[in-house]
A protein has these predicted regions:
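N-terminal alpha-helical interaction modules that lie
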Residues: 1-66
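Conserved small-residue packing positions in alpha-helical repeats and bundles
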Residues: 7, 14, 67, 71-81
Length: 81
């Protein structure tokens, strides 16, 4: 349950930063979330294919968190153009 709360908080922060146009800060927040919630090195998370990243995570809760973070990664990329 703790991970769900942490994920919700991280996604809310990311959404707020993205909406405010603070894209660099959103990217930093996303990196931190990939490491703490997804268990993935942020450098890998920035570059790797979603399918590969999801295959690296066995825990269902972490996999779900990673999926949500990958969706946010795509939104951030779209916001950057």
């Amino acid at each position: 349950m703790r991970m769900v709360r942490q994920l919700a908080e991280a996604l809310a922060r990311l959404s707020g930063l993205r909406a405010a146009g603070q894209l660099d800060q959103a990217a930093e927040e996303l990196d931190a979330a990939f490491a703490s919630l997804g268990g993935i090195d942020p450098r890998l998370a920035r570059e790797a294919d979603a399918g590969l990243l999801l295959s690296l995570v066995q825990d269902p809760s972490r996999r779900e968190a990673l999926l949500r973070l990958l969706e946010e990664r795509d939104r951030l990329r779209a916001a950057r153009g």
